[in-house]
Amino acid sequence: MSDAKAIMEMIKENDITYVDLRFTDPRGKMQHVTQHIDTIDEESLAEGFMFDGSSIAGWKAINESDMTLMPDLYRCYVDPFFAQPTLALFCDVLEPSTGEAYSRDPRSTAKAALAHMEAAGLGDTAFFGPEAEFFIFEDVKIDVSMNRAMYAVDSVEGPYNSARDYEEGNLGHRPGVKGGYFPVPPIDSGQDIRGEMLSVMADMGVPVEKHHHEVAPSQHELGMKFGTLIETADNLQLYKYSVHQVAAAYGLDRKSTRLNSSHSSVSRMPSS
């Protein structure tokens, strides 16, 4: 059974309506285009999908905008956030005229680095274990205009809010300066949201380990296992995606949602 056949079977088994093609831009931000399943078959999965590369900052000029998204069929997952059942695939970006990897595609850069490592005899496998951390704020303001430039962040955990008036009262449960590592709730106000972020990551196939509050107020860490370069880079993109999506969901209703968790599943295709 080919990988494309396995993907088509997964689409059928999970009643998939859309296939989301995802790639990373030069700034490290994940981008996507969503294809209806009527456009998906073994042939299209093998040939790839055309898109406008000139609209991605730092890539092609308008007169050479055509580029190809080539799905990586060895790993896919059902997106747990989308209302419609959607299968997501990581993609490489190719030059359509030659079929070669595009030099400014981060995934292609990673593959070129691995090829150089092997060719130079430096090693045959490289493992990476990033320790990603982030802050959660209730309010963020940014302004750059003709007469001023400013930013301001706000968090209920911030010591600067110890005398602030809240409608429900100021309960005073917040870490002091450099006091966030690692008291239990209610001082740690992020227990549930971090747990949901980590669970969603696991749903999408990321090998997770732990989560905890970090030293600073509003600072958090999710732990995942190390892996090879491409695997870890893909996992880190899913890390960021999970953090942003879950935080956005909590920002809308201030409670756990586990959006469409019934649709969630993951598949790692065996490498050939």
Stretches found by the model and what they are:
Residues 1-258, 272:
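Glycine-rich, acidic/polar active-site loops that bind/position phosphate-bearing ligands
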Residues 260-263, 267-272:
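Hydrophobic alpha-helical segments, chiefly the membrane-spanning helices
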